[in-house]
Amino acid sequence: MKMNYSGTSERRILIFKRLIAGEHLSYQQLAEDYFVSRSSIAKDISYLKELFQKESLRLRFDNSGTFFEGSESQIHRVLKRFCLMMLDQPAAFSLLVEPEKYQEVNQAFRRALVEKQVEMPDSYIQSIVLSIVLLIERASHAENLV
Protein backbone atom coordinates (compact mmCIF):
# COMPACT_ATOMS: atom_id res chain seq x y z
CA MET A 1 0.00 0.00 0.00
CA LYS A 2 2.45 2.68 -1.22
CA MET A 3 1.21 6.17 -0.42
CA ASN A 4 2.04 9.70 -1.38
CA TYR A 5 2.11 12.26 1.38
CA SER A 6 3.56 15.70 1.95
CA GLY A 7 5.28 15.38 5.31
CA THR A 8 5.59 14.16 8.84
CA SER A 9 2.24 15.51 10.08
CA GLU A 10 0.34 13.93 7.23
CA ARG A 11 2.16 10.61 7.66
CA ARG A 12 1.36 10.59 11.37
CA ILE A 13 -2.29 11.26 10.66
CA LEU A 14 -2.43 8.45 8.12
CA ILE A 15 -0.77 6.04 10.56
CA PHE A 16 -3.14 7.21 13.31
CA LYS A 17 -6.16 6.54 11.09
CA ARG A 18 -4.90 3.05 10.35
CA LEU A 19 -4.40 2.38 14.06
CA ILE A 20 -7.91 3.46 15.03
CA ALA A 21 -9.24 1.35 12.15
CA GLY A 22 -7.80 -1.68 13.94
CA GLU A 23 -4.79 -2.44 11.73
CA HIS A 24 -1.68 -4.14 13.10
CA LEU A 25 1.22 -2.06 11.77
CA SER A 26 4.85 -3.16 11.58
CA TYR A 27 7.61 -0.58 11.42
CA GLN A 28 9.03 -2.25 8.33
CA GLN A 29 5.72 -2.20 6.46
CA LEU A 30 5.07 1.42 7.42
CA ALA A 31 8.58 2.40 6.30
CA GLU A 32 7.90 0.79 2.93
CA ASP A 33 4.41 2.28 2.64
CA TYR A 34 5.58 5.83 3.30
CA PHE A 35 9.09 5.65 1.78
CA VAL A 36 10.85 6.63 5.00
CA SER A 37 13.30 4.98 7.38
CA ARG A 38 12.28 2.74 10.25
CA SER A 39 13.68 5.38 12.62
CA SER A 40 11.23 7.94 11.19
CA ILE A 41 8.42 5.46 11.78
CA ALA A 42 9.69 4.86 15.33
CA LYS A 43 9.44 8.62 15.97
CA ASP A 44 5.93 8.68 14.51
CA ILE A 45 4.81 5.78 16.70
CA SER A 46 6.40 7.44 19.75
CA TYR A 47 4.49 10.66 18.96
CA LEU A 48 1.23 8.74 18.58
CA LYS A 49 1.90 6.73 21.73
CA GLU A 50 2.13 10.02 23.67
CA LEU A 51 -1.10 11.23 22.06
CA PHE A 52 -2.91 8.08 23.18
CA GLN A 53 -1.38 8.36 26.67
CA LYS A 54 -2.84 11.86 27.06
CA GLU A 55 -6.23 10.15 26.95
CA SER A 56 -5.04 7.38 29.30
CA LEU A 57 -5.03 4.94 26.38
CA ARG A 58 -2.28 2.62 25.23
CA LEU A 59 -0.97 1.38 21.95
CA ARG A 60 -0.23 -2.32 22.13
CA PHE A 61 2.58 -4.28 20.54
CA ASP A 62 2.86 -7.93 19.53
CA ASN A 63 4.75 -10.02 16.99
CA SER A 64 2.65 -8.63 14.13
CA GLY A 65 3.22 -4.98 15.04
CA THR A 66 1.67 -2.03 16.79
CA PHE A 67 -2.10 -1.82 17.21
CA PHE A 68 -4.87 -0.17 19.21
CA GLU A 69 -7.76 -1.99 20.81
CA GLY A 70 -10.39 0.28 22.23
CA SER A 71 -14.04 1.15 22.39
CA GLU A 72 -15.70 3.66 20.12
CA SER A 73 -15.77 6.20 22.96
CA GLN A 74 -12.01 5.78 23.45
CA ILE A 75 -11.42 6.22 19.73
CA HIS A 76 -13.63 9.31 19.80
CA ARG A 77 -11.62 10.85 22.66
CA VAL A 78 -8.22 10.39 21.04
CA LEU A 79 -9.53 11.37 17.59
CA LYS A 80 -11.03 14.54 19.02
CA ARG A 81 -7.77 15.42 20.77
CA PHE A 82 -5.83 14.95 17.52
CA CYS A 83 -8.35 17.04 15.57
CA LEU A 84 -8.18 19.89 18.09
CA MET A 85 -4.39 19.85 17.78
CA MET A 86 -4.70 20.14 13.98
CA LEU A 87 -7.37 22.86 13.79
CA ASP A 88 -4.78 25.48 12.84
CA GLN A 89 -3.35 23.25 10.08
CA PRO A 90 -6.09 23.06 7.43
CA ALA A 91 -4.36 20.47 5.22
CA ALA A 92 -3.73 18.14 8.15
CA PHE A 93 -7.16 18.77 9.69
CA SER A 94 -8.84 17.86 6.40
CA LEU A 95 -7.27 14.39 6.61
CA LEU A 96 -9.15 13.82 9.87
CA VAL A 97 -12.44 15.63 9.26
CA GLU A 98 -14.32 16.79 6.18
CA PRO A 99 -13.80 20.59 6.34
CA GLU A 100 -17.13 21.33 4.63
CA LYS A 101 -19.01 19.24 7.16
CA TYR A 102 -17.16 20.93 10.02
CA GLN A 103 -18.02 24.39 8.66
CA GLU A 104 -21.66 23.45 8.11
CA VAL A 105 -22.10 22.14 11.67
CA ASN A 106 -20.11 25.07 13.09
CA GLN A 107 -22.31 27.64 11.34
CA ALA A 108 -25.54 25.86 12.32
CA PHE A 109 -24.46 25.57 15.95
CA ARG A 110 -23.40 29.22 16.14
CA ARG A 111 -26.70 30.30 14.56
CA ALA A 112 -28.59 28.29 17.17
CA LEU A 113 -26.59 29.92 19.97
CA VAL A 114 -27.41 33.38 18.61
CA GLU A 115 -31.11 32.52 18.22
CA LYS A 116 -31.26 31.20 21.79
CA GLN A 117 -29.13 34.10 23.04
CA VAL A 118 -26.60 31.76 24.60
CA GLU A 119 -23.05 32.93 25.14
CA MET A 120 -20.30 30.34 25.18
CA PRO A 121 -16.50 30.47 24.97
CA ASP A 122 -15.13 29.72 21.51
CA SER A 123 -13.11 26.78 22.83
CA TYR A 124 -16.34 25.13 24.06
CA ILE A 125 -18.00 25.73 20.71
CA GLN A 126 -15.06 24.15 18.85
CA SER A 127 -15.14 21.14 21.15
CA ILE A 128 -18.90 20.61 20.82
CA VAL A 129 -18.91 21.12 17.05
CA LEU A 130 -16.01 18.72 16.62
CA SER A 131 -17.74 16.07 18.75
CA ILE A 132 -20.87 16.35 16.62
CA VAL A 133 -18.92 16.14 13.36
CA LEU A 134 -16.90 13.13 14.52
CA LEU A 135 -20.07 11.31 15.57
CA ILE A 136 -21.70 12.05 12.22
CA GLU A 137 -18.65 11.00 10.21
CA ARG A 138 -18.00 7.78 12.12
CA ALA A 139 -21.69 6.85 12.03
CA SER A 140 -21.88 7.54 8.30
CA HIS A 141 -18.89 5.26 7.73
CA ALA A 142 -20.74 2.45 9.52
CA GLU A 143 -18.51 2.47 12.58
CA ASN A 144 -19.96 0.78 15.65
CA LEU A 145 -20.94 3.51 18.06
CA VAL A 146 -20.93 2.25 21.64
Residue ranges and their predicted role:
Residues 1-146:
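A cross-family "folded-core" feature that marks the main globular domain of proteins
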